[in-house]
C-alpha cells in the first residue's frame, strides 16, 4: 500500500531549512537524561513508529548502532545513538523502507531533540527514489526541548537520478561526524507537510539531474518564483516534472513553468492534457512545441542582448495586462523571441532598453489559456516584479487577485520579532525614543494600512497590494532606523565582480559603501588563471583590457572615500575568467587536477604541483608590490573535495613524502588507514605552504598589510575533507583575520557556528561571513534577517562581520537601510 499526501491546511513553515549546516551545543545535559515533554502533534502522520519492530525496521549502516524505541508522553520516540568516540565512521546513519507518494505534498515534518549536538557536524534526511536521492540538512532551534523541523521538497538537493517524489521507497536519517565524542538524538511524529494548493509550480527535476550547474540553475529560478509567490501571499505547491499527472491537477487553477528546459515527453503530454481539460498555464522562457500549439503562441529563436542594457525593462503594450506596472526593471541578457498567433494571442508587454527605447521584442504574450514571459523572472526590482507576476496570474485566474490582496494585508508588520501589524507598531514605537523620523515612518505606515484595508473592501485589489507594500516599506524602514550602531567594528563586503556593481562606476559603488558605514571591501581581482589588471604572471580576463585596470579604479575610489581595499584571489580554481588557451596549456603540462576515478578536473590547478604553488604565491605578491592595498584575501584556498587530487604528479610527490611506493594507486590511499592519515596530512601541507609564504613575504613587501581568508565553517572536518587547516593558520599568525562562510538562514545555527569558530581562531579576529546573496538564503533582500545576524555577531563580540555579496540589489536596497541604523557611522565617510 502506498501512503499518499492528505489534503491538509497549510502550516506556516519555520524557515530553518538549509543545505549545509554545522551544529554546535550550548548545554551540558548528559546523554540519556529524561526527555522533555513532546508538544502536541496536529498534523497527519506518515509514521508514529508504533507499527512493527522499529528497532529492527530502521537498519543501521555499517558501524552505526541500532535504534531504540521509547514510549514517552504517550508517543513512540526513536532514540538514535551516535557512537563517534574511537570509531572511524564518517556518519551514524539508519534506513527504513517505505512506500510513499509525496508528490502533492510540500514536504515532511517531524519533532527533533538533541541535548548535545557538537559531535555532529550536520544532520541530514534523505528520500530514496529510483536510482537516486533527495536530501536536505536541518538544524535544531534549541537544545532545551523539541524542535519542529520542516523539510520542504523545494529545498532538497538531488543526488544521482531519483525517479520522482511519487516513488519514495526508503528514508535515511544521518548525523555526520564532527568530534570524537558520542551523542544521541531523538525523533517523533514523522508526518506530511502541506498540500492542496490552487497554484502549482513545476520544477524541472529531470533537467536538474544532468549536472551540478543545471541543478543550481533550476533551483535558482524556482526559488525566485517561490519567493515572489510567498511575498504575495499566494498558496502554492512545487511539483517535480517527474510526478506530473493531469489527474492530480484537478484542483490546480494555475500551472507555472518557471524554467523548464528539456521537459520530458511524458510531462509534456500530462501538461497538454491539463490544458485540454481547461487548465491555465504561465510559462517562462521555454515551452515545448506541443504546448505552444495548445497555448496559441509561437516561439522563434533565442536572442542575445546586442549590448549591456539592451533588455532592461518590461513595459505595457497597447492592450496590457490589468494591474501591471508602468515600468518593471529586469536586466536580462537573453530572451526567446515570440510571435502572437492572430485570433489566439496578443502582445501584452514589450522589452525596452536602458535608454527607454523599445527593442521591438515582445516580453509577454497572452492567450485565453496561457501567459508566456520571454525570459525567466529575476529577483531585481522585486516590488514591481511581484505586481507584474500577479498581473500575469490574475489575467488567467482573476480570483488570485483577492487572495493576493488578503495575503499582502496579513503580511504587514509580520517580520523579525513581530507577528502582525499591531505588534510591529508597538515594538518599533517602544524603541523609537521620540525619534521624530521614526514616528513619521510609523504614521505613514498607518495611513497606507488604512488605505489598503479600504481598497480591499472595495475589491480594488491592485491598489490594496500597492498600499500594503507601502505600509510594509515604511514599517521596515522604521525598524531599520531604530537599530543601534556599534562604532569601531569591521564592516566588510565581499564583491565577486571585478568590475564592481553593474551599472555603477567603482567610485559610485565604493561611495555607497562608505556613506553607509562600511570599513572595507574584499574585491575579487584575480583567479587561478586570470587577472583583471595588468599582470606579468596571469593572462588578462575577458573585457579586462577593454575596461581598463580594475584594481587601480577600485583602489583609487577606496582611497578617496577612506575605505580599506583587500584584494581577493580565487586560488587554484581557474573558473570562467581564464582563457581556454591557458587552461589547455596547464592541462598539457600536467598541472590540472584529476579526481579519484581519474576524471580530469581541467579548471582546477593541482595544489601539490610546485609550479602551481609558485604561481599562487607570486601572483598574490605581485598585487602587494604594485598596489597600495590594505590586504590580501584567500578564497578557494583548499581542494575542491575529498576526491582530489589524484594526478600522476600527486602520486609521485606523495610517495616521496611517504618514503615508499604505493602498490595500488589511488585505492590504497583510502583503504589503508595509515596511508590515508599521511595522505590527509600531505594535502594540508600543500595548502599550508602557500598561506605561510604569502603571509610572510607580503609583510616584507608591504609592512602592515593584512592577510585574511574565506574559509569553510567546520574546521575539524574541513581540514580533512578539503585540506583547509585554518585553525593552524590562525595559531601560527599567518592570518590577521578570518572570515568563515557561515551561510545559513538559521539564526540559532549561525550563533553556534560563531561560538566554536571564535575558539578555533584564538587571538585572530573572526569576522563571520553572512550569506545574504548565497543560495542558502531564499530572499537576497531580507534586511531583517541580515540585521538579526549582524546583531548576533555583536552579541558574540566578534568585532566585525563580512557580507556576501556586493551587487546592485545590495547597493540600491540593502546598504541604504543598513545605513539608517545598524551601520550608521558618519566618521567612516569623510
Question: What function would you assign to each model-found segment?
Answer:
Residues 196-200, 224-228, 357-482, 815, ...:
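Extracellular ligand-binding/catalytic regions of CAZymes and related secreted enzymes
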Amino acid at each position: 500500500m502506498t501512503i499518499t499526501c492528505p489534503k491538509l491546511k497549510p502550516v506556516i513553515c519555520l524557515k530553518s531549512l538549509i543545505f549545509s549546516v554545522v551544529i554546535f551545543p550550548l548545554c551540558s545535559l548528559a546523554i540519556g537524561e529524561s526527555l522533555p515533554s513532546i508538544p502536541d502533534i496536529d498534523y497527519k502522520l506518515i509514521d508514529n513508529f508504533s507499527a512493527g519492530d522499529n528497532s529492527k525496521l530502521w537498519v543501521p549502516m555499517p558501524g552505526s548502532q541500532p535504534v531504540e524505541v521509547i514510549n514517552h508522553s504517550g508517543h513512540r520516540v526513536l532514540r538514535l545513538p551516535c557512537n563517534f568516540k574511537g570509531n572511524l565512521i564518517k556518519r551514524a546513519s539508519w534506513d527504513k523502507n517505505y512506500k510513499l507518494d509525496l508528490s502533492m505534498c510540500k514536504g515532511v515534518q517531524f519533532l527533533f531533540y538533541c541535548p548535545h549536538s557538537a559531535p555532529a557536524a550536520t544532520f541530514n534526511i534523505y528520500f530514496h527514489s529510483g536510482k537516486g536521492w533527495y536530501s536536505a540538512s536541518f538544524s535544531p532551534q534549541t537544545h532545551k526541548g523539541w524542535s519542529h523541523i520542516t523539510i520542504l521538497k523545494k529545498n532538497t538537493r538531488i543526488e544521482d537520478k531519483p525517479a520522482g517524489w511519487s516513488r519514495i521507497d526508503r528514508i535515511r536519517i544521518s548525523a555526520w561526524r564532527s568530534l570524537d565524542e558520542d551523542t544521541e538524538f531523538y525523533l517523533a511524529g514523522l508526518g506530511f507537510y502541506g498540500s492542496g494548493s490552487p497554484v502549482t509550480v513545476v520544477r524541472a527535476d529531470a533537467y536538474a539531474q544532468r549536472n551540478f550547474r543545471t541543478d543550481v540553475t533550476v533551483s535558482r529560478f524556482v526559488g525566485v518564483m517561490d519567493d515572489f509567490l510567498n511575498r504575495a501571499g499566494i498558496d502554492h505547491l512545487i511539483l517535480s516534472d517527474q510526478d506530473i499527472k493531469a489527474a492530480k491537477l484537478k484542483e490546480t487553477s494555475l500551472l507555472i513553468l518557471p524554467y523548464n528546459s528539456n521537459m520530458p515527453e511524458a510531462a509534456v503530454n500530462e501538461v497538454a492534457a491539463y490544458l485540454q481539460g481547461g487548465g491555465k498555464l504561465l510559462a517562462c522562457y521555454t515551452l515545448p512545441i506541443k504546448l505552444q500549439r495548445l497555448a496559441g503562441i509561437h516561439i522563434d529563436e533565442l536572442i542575445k542582448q546586442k549590448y549591456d542594457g539592451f533588455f532592461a525593462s518590461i513595459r505595457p503594450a497597447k492592450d496590457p495586462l490589468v494591474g501591471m506596472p508602468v515600468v518593471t526593471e529586469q536586466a536580462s541578457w537573453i530572451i526567446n523571441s515570440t510571435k502572437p498567433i492572430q485570433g489566439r494571442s496578443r502582445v501584452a508587454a514589450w522589452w525596452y532598453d536602458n535608454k527607454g527605447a523599445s527593442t521591438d521584442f515582445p516580453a509577454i504574450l497572452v492567450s485565453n489559456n496561457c501567459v508566456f514571459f520571454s525570459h525567466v523572472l529575476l529577483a531585481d526590482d522585486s516590488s514591481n516584479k511581484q505586481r507584474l507576476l500577479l498581473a500575469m496570474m490574475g489575467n488567467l485566474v482573476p480570483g488570485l487577485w483577492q487572495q493576493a490582496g488578503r495575503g499582502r494585508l496579513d503580511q504587514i508588520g509580520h517580520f523579525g520579532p513581530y507577528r502582525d501589524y499591531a505588534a510591529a507598531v508597538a515594538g518599533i514605537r517602544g524603541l523609537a525614543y521620540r525619534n521624530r523620523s521614526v514616528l513619521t515612518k510609523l504614521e505613514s505606515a498607518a495611513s497606507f494600512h488604512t488605505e489598503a484595508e479600504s481598497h480591499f473592501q472595495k475589491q480594488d485589489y491592485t491598489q490594496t497590494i500597492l498600499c500594503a507594500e507601502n505600509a510594509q516599506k515604511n514599517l521596515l524602514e522604521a525598524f531599520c532606523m531604530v537599530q543601534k550602531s556599534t562604532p569601531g567594528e569591521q564592516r566588510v563586503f565581499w564583491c565577486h565582480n571585478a568590475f564592481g556593481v553593474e551599472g555603477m562606476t567603482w567610485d559610485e559603488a565604493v561611495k555607497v559603501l562608505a556613506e553607509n558605514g562600511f570599513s572595507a571591501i574584499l574585491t575579487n581581482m584575480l583567479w587561478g588563471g586570470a587577472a583583471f589588471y595588468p599582470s606579468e604572471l596571469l593572462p588578462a580576463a575577458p573585457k579586462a583590457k577593454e575596461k581598463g585596470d580594475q584594481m587601480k579604479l577600485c583602489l583609487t575610489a577606496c582611497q578617496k572615500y577612506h575605505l580599506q581595499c583587500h584584494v581577493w584571489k580565487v586560488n587554484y580554481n581557474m573558473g570562467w575568467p581564464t582563457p581556454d588557451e591557458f587552461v589547455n596549456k596547464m592541462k598539457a603540462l600536467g598541472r590540472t587536477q584529476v579526481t579519484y576515478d581519474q576524471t580530469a578536473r581541467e579548471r582546477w590547478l593541482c595544489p601539490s604541483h610546485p609550479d602551481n604553488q609558485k604561481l599562487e604565491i607570486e601572483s598574490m605578491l605581485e598585487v602587494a608590490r604594485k598596489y597600495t592595498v590594505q590586504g590580501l584575501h584567500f578564497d578557494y584556498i583548499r581542494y575542491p573535495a575529498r576526491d582530489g587530487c589524484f594526478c600522476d604528479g600527486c602520486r609521485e610527490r606523495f610517495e616521496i613524502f611517504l618514503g615508499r611506493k604505493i602498490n595500488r594507486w589511488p585505492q590504497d590511499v583510502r583503504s589503508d588507514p595509515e596511508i590515508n592519515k599521511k595522505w590527509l596530512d600531505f594535502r594540508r601541507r600543500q595548502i599550508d605552504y602557500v598561506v605561510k609564504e604569502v603571509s610572510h613575504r607580503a609583510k616584507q613587501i608591504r609592512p602592515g598589510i593584512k592577510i585574511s581568508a574565506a574559509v569553510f565553517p567546520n574546521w575539524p572536518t574541513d581540514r580533512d575533507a578539503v585540506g583547509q587547516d585554518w585553525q593552524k593558520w590562525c595559531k601560527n599568525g599567518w592570518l590577521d583575520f578570518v572570515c568563515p562562510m557561515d551561510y545559513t538562514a538559521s539564526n540559532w545555527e549561525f550563533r553556534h557556528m560563531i561560538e566554536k569558530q571564535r575558539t578555533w581562531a584564538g587571538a585572530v579576529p573572526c569576522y563571520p561571513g553572512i550569506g545574504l546573496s548565497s543560495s542558502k538564503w531564499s530572499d537576497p533582500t531580507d534586511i531583517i534577517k541580515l540585521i538579526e545576524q549582524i546583531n548576533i555577531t555583536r552579541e558574540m563580540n566578534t568585532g566585525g562581520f563580512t557580507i556576501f555579496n556586493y551587487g546592485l540589489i545590495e547597493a540600491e536596497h540593502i546598504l541604504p537601510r543598513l545605513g539608517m541604523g545598524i551601520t550608521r557611522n558618519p566618521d567612516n565617510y569623510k
